[in-house]
Amino acid sequence: MSGRKPGTTGDTIVNLGLTAAILLCWLVLHAFTLWLLDAAAHPLLAVLCLAGLTWLSVGLFIIAHDAMHGSVVPGRPRANAAIGQLALWLYAGFSWPKLIAKHMTHHRHAGTDNDPDFGHGGPVRWYGSFVSTYFGWREGLLLPVIVTTYALILGDRWMYVIFWPVPAVLASIQIFVFGTWLPHRPGHDDFPDRHNARSTGIGDPLSLLTCFHFGGYHHEHHLHPHVPWWRLPRTRKTGGRA
């Protein structure tokens, strides 16, 4: 697997397999928590479900992110757009056209005032700016409707609807800290090049758990944006050859 070049049939199979696994795991755990979980009787299980959904929600966003770069199904822009929009809908009802436009701007102007992901001040202020960039009036109108509809369908279990928005919010914090703030914050140390991005240098297990390698290998991502998340560690080990 490590000897293939990105975009080969083998890589596409791996991309689609991992994408399907993340989507399926999220859907199964989402359905379980909303319809079957007894949080009062099993509080530890409820916490584990929340943690699992948070990590899988990060995974949904990463699927959409890779789709933006055309790396889920290389050479198939419509397939990437469909998969990316599905992942964003499940994550928080976000708009694919809006996010892909802003993300491409981020890559062109990373770490500058023209970067929609870049912010000034401390991490809390920067996070607020980061969220407001992607969470607009459309999401502000759509999400309450979805949550209310969910609550009505759940009936007596209406409180379990929190297992959709809460993991999404926690995931956004996780994505921001490990995928934006740590890699792009100025003044911490010198950036290696014009991409104004650094890799956090944490080990591969933590890199996977925190942000599907987009923190641990963020500079590598800016150097090789079409490399899918699971191949990012390979780019460093091979000196840039994915």
Curated annotation (Swiss-Prot):
Function of the protein: Converts beta-carotene to canthaxanthin via echinenone.
Record-level GO BP terms: carotenoid biosynthetic process
Signal peptide: none
Full protein name: Beta-carotene ketolase
GO MF entry, a single one: oxidoreductase activity
Pathway membership: Carotenoid biosynthesis; astaxanthin biosynthesis
Species of the source: Paracoccus sp. (strain PC1) (Alcaligenes sp. (strain PC1))
The enzyme's E.C. designation: 1.14.99.63
One Pfam family hit: FA_desaturase
Catalytic activity line of the entry: all-trans-beta-carotene + 2 AH2 + 2 O2 = echinenone + 2 A + 3 H2O; echinenone + 2 AH2 + 2 O2 = canthaxanthin + 2 A + 3 H2O
Keywords, comma-separated and alphabetical: Carotenoid biosynthesis, Oxidoreductase
